[in-house]
Amino acid sequence: MKRTLKDYLLDLRGAAEETQRFTKGITLEEFLRDRKTSNAVIRSLEVMGEAAKKIPEEVRSRYPEIPWKRVAGMRDVLIHEYHGVELEIIWKTVREELPPLQPLLEKMFQELAKEL
């Protein structure tokens, strides 16, 4: 079954929300010790990056405030450098970069959902 733009938007939004749920109420130290949580967060970031790559350029250009290259680039690092992933950087990304990104993703989803 061919995936649609809406599917990728849902993937992107859902994975961003998952990372926040997975890390809610835990400390960096707990995150570093809990392999299940860190792996789940890494997987969600991979999904976000893959979905970002699948969103057409004409859509991405309408939302320049979303750091498309950074989102996709994180996926590439996680996939290709999996053995050298620094969990502290993942934690910082989830805690500092994703919270301001989520409202932008939601706005984009709401606007585009009307067109789909």
Predicted regions and their residues:
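Solvent-exposed interaction patches of small proteins and small membrane subunits
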Residues: 1-116
